[in-house]
Every structure is written in structure tokens, then in C-alpha cells.
């Protein structure tokens, strides 16, 4: 499989619809409303709704809380469309978890009672860290040993900014990726600096509470309870940050990460800096031949990753679906949104 690049220790998966579950942890961070910080919505205000609508696309195959799917300001569609098409193609089961919804999706989800994460430049990001971790622990116990492979994915607009702030707080000065073609690094840096002036916290869990988001905390809780199954963190530099934190806090084994080539080649150094390269599987997707222009834009540095898109592609390829069949399923599914 030339379109899957495995690290030295990441080619270890046996995948089928019975032994694998896809868990989407979706939630809002008020960071996403800062102008220029993310393209995960047509306007900063609409980014608050993206996690709920992404969840509806994954759960129902359509938008119920909005006429249209989440789009970038340029009109490029949410990666949830890609992920849902692949999950439908492979028949892999999914679970949606409330990681701090601003608006509740109109599809079944695991209710954690979590509220949106705050902008850390203004106040503590996670109001009840223990509750978020505890919710994750319960979910982890439910899944552990039932499935051989547990994919943890996210829909958190602004999450590369919270990831950057958390890493910087614990002494890792590395750039995260972005859903935008041009990374708004100066804005991320300003938010981190304002957050540190408000309160400086250098411990891993303390940094998650002060500068992170609920998705991070729920993921850490899930991992702490999973002893028998493999976990694949499905995502880009957000989930790389979670995996690194998981090592520091939980010290778990059988943990891997899968992302798209668009993220990996944008921020290759982050994965090596965090010591994750050996446990990484890169989905080197090629959208240049997609039927619809909105999808072709992915090939040129827009969006890059989200809702576990890279991990979903990995699962399909491991199940011996040809790349062209995967691309066709995405094109066909996107038709209904046009």
C-alpha cells in the first residue's frame, strides 16, 4: 500500500467491522470564535456549531441542525463528509461523545454533561477537569476488550491552538498544524501568551485544565481505562498532543496515531519532536482527481484533517478497499450536499 506510510512499530493492525470501533469526541472551544484562528466554519460564530453538525453527518448521514454542512470561508466542506463516506463503505461502527457541545446534535450520542471549553486567554479552559476525565474513564471501561481497535477522533474547531498552548506550557515549543492553508501562528502565539499571563501552569494535567479542551481530557480518561485494546489516535497535531500527554500522564502502551499526509508533511517535525514517528501511520490520500472542486482543494493545503479522516482511510485500506473505491464513495456521498 503505497498510500499508507507506517512507522517502525505501527504496522500492527488487524481490522474488520467486528473488532473495530470509531469514537468521535466532538465539542466546542471558545477559541474558535477568535477571528482568523480556524477555517472550520464559514464565520467565527458558526464554528461553535461545527461539532454538532459534524456529529449529525457521522450519525445520520445528513445535516439536521443546519441547511448546509460546515464549510470553510472558501466553501470547502467539512472532513466529516469524508469520514462518514468511509465508515459507511467499511461498515465500521461508531460512537459519538459529547466533548462540550455548544448545541446538541440531533443524533444519538453519549452524554457527558460537559459544557463548551473556554478561551484560555480569558479564563480556565476546562471548568471541571475531573468530570471530563471521569466520563472518559467510564467510556474506556465499556469499550476495553470488547474491540481490538479503538479509534479516538475529534471535532474541535480551534483545537490546534489549544494543543499549541498546552505543549508550550509543558516546555515543547513546536508549531501545530492548522485547518487554514496559511497557519495563523501569530494568533496562536498571542493566545498562548495571554493565557500564560493569566495563569502559568507547567504540569501536564494542569496545562490541559488551563489551556486545553474537553476533548483532550475525555481522551485521556478513555485511554487510562483501556488496558487490553489498541488505541489509534485519529487526527493531526491535536491528537498527537493527546498521545504525547497520554504517555506522560497514563504511561500506556499499544497506542498509535494515524493522520493524513497533508498534516504530516506540513508538520513532520512535531511528530518526531514528540517521539511519535515510530507509532504513526500516515494516510497519503490524493484528492487531485476528485469530481468536486471543494474536495480537490484538500490536495492544496486546505483543511488537512478532522473527524479522524486519516484514520478512517487507514482502516479502509487495511480492509483491502482500493483507494479509487474509497475516493468514489466520498465523491458520491458529497453529491447529496451540493
Curated annotation (Swiss-Prot):
Residues in the signal sequence: none
GO molecular function, one term: nicotinate-nucleotide-dimethylbenzimidazole phosphoribosyltransferase activity
Cross-referenced NCBIfam families: PRK04447.1-5
Family to which the UniProt record says this protein belongs: Belongs to the UPF0284 family.
Protein name: UPF0284 protein TV0153
UniProt source species: Thermoplasma volcanium (strain ATCC 51530 / DSM 4299 / JCM 9571 / NBRC 15438 / GSS1)
Taxonomic lineage: Archaea, Methanobacteriati, Thermoplasmatota, Thermoplasmata, Thermoplasmatales
Amino acid at each position: 500500500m503505497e498510500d499508507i506510510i507506517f512507522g517502525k512499530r505501527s504496522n500492527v493492525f488487524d481490522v474488520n467491522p467486528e473488532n473495530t470501533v470509531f469514537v468521535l469526541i466532538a465539542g466546542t472551544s471558545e477559541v474558535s470564535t477568535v477571528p482568523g484562528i480556524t477555517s472550520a466554519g464559514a464565520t467565527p460564530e458558526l464554528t461553535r456549531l461545527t461539532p454538532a453538525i459534524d456529529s449529525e453527518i457521522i450519525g445520520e448521514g445528513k445535516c439536521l441542525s443546519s441547511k448546509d454542512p460546515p464549510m470553510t470561508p472558501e466553501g470547502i466542506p467539512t472532513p466529516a463528509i469524508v469520514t462518514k463516506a468511509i465508515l459507511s463503505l467499511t461498515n465500521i461502527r461508531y460512537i459519538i461523545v459529547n466533548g462540550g457541545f455548544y448545541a446538541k446534535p440531533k443524533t444519538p450520542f453519549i452524554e457527558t454533561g460537559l459544557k463548551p471549553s473556554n478561551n484560555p486567554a480569558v479564563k480556565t479552559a476546562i471548568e471541571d477537569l475531573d468530570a471530563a476525565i471521569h466520563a472518559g474513564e467510564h467510556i474506556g471501561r465499556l469499550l476495553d476488550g470488547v474491540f481490538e481497535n479503538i479509534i479516538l477522533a475529534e471535532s474541535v474547531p480551534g483545537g490546534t491552538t489549544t494543543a499549541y498552548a498546552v505543549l508550550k506550557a509543558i516546555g515543547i515549543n513546536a508549531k501545530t498544524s492548522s485547518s487554514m492553508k496559511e497557519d495563523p501562528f501569530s494568533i496562536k502565539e498571542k493566545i498562548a501568551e495571554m493565557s500564560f499571563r493569566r495563569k502559568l501552569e507547567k504540569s501536564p494535567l494542569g496545562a490541559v485544565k488551563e489551556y486545553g479542551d474537553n476533548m483532550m481530557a475525555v481522551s485521556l480518561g478513555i485511554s487510562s481505562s483501556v488496558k487490553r485494546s489498541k488505541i489509534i489516535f485519529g487526527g493531526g497535531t491535536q491528537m498527537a498532543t493527546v498521545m504525547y500527554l497520554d504517555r506522560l500522564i497514563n504511561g500506556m502502551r499499544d497506542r498509535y496515531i494515524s493522520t493524513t499526509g497533508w498534516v504530516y508533511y506540513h508538520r513532520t517535525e512535531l511528530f518526531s519532536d514528540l517521539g511519535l514517528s515510530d507509532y504513526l501511520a500516515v494516510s497519503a490520500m490524493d484528492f487531485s482527481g476528485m469530481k468536486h472542486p471543494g474536495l480537490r482543494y484538500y490536495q492544496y493545503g486546505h483543511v488537512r484533517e478532522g473527524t479522524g479522516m486519516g484514520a478512517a482511510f487507514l482502516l479502509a485500506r487495511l480492509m483491502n478497499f482500493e483507494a479509487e473505491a474509497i475516493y468514489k464513495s466520498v465523491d458520491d456521498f458529497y453529491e447529496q450536499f451540493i
